[in-house]
Amino acid sequence: MKIGIVGAGNIVPDFLEASKNIEDFEIVSISATENGRERMKKLSEEYGIKNIYTNYEDLLNDDIDVVYIAIPNSLHYEFAKKAIERNKHIILEKPFTTTYREAEELVELAQEYGIMLFEAISNQYLPNYKKTKELISELGDIKIVQLNYSQYSSRYDRFKNGDIAPAFDPKKSGGALMDLNVYNIYYIVGLFGSPQKILYTANIERNIDTSGVLVLDYGSFKCVAVGEKDCKAPLSMNIQGDKGLIKVIGTLNEV
């Protein structure tokens, strides 16, 4: 399987490291903006990537089977759509798209072209999640679920001084909900399905949510998901029932 990577941000080395453990998985190409050329060069030398491009079309012209898209959130739809129309399978970084309608259109288009389209979020495939799902029936009636994903961003100080990275740019669909709280959402919805009601309250700076509290109302119980890029706290999850408690300390994708 031949892979082309779009983007050269912080998540890409993690993807490249993981790819070492997959048989018949060859990273052929990487594409980013001109500003990312030096970083692409470094990655290509370290991981043996043959081709470097600053034009996405050049990457799509390569002999590749799959495109891994790891670029600002606002570009996911556009780049994924082009890849589908070129008959490339897609691994799309989270969040899948900026809007529900964009997600619907990509899924419909992928089905039309017979393309496999994946979102690169791992929570629901890891032992931690599977063990939680296995034990949850022992808790009795669920009453309260609390999740906290707080991570003081390495870009936050620059953001306060006016240097706006994509993760803090409202025009690029950044913010705490899209960047961090999305992990909590996947965990909750994976365990309990869709809520009846949703309320999101956020701390706003420069028109972006730097932290926020998401309340998911399931009728008989409530879930509270906190995502913060402007402060830090121990990462944790509590699922409380009338007969027991599941408590996780650390990121939800840890074992």
Task: Locate predicted features.
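Beta-loop-alpha module in the N-terminal Rossmann-like domain of NAD(P)-dependent dehydrogenases
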Residues: 36, 47-109
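N-terminal Rossmann-like dinucleotide-binding module
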Residues: 1-47
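Predominantly a Rossmann-like dinucleotide-binding segment in NAD(P)-dependent oxidoreductases
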Residues: 123-195
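Glycine-rich beta-alpha junction loops
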Residues: 34, 124-125, 148-154, 204-205, ...
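Receiver (REC) domain switch-region micro-motif
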Residues: 30, 67, 145
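Contiguous beta-strand/loop segments that form the cofactor/metal-binding neighborhood of enzyme cores
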Residues: 185-254
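Rossmann-fold dehydrogenase core element
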Residues: 104-122, 141-144
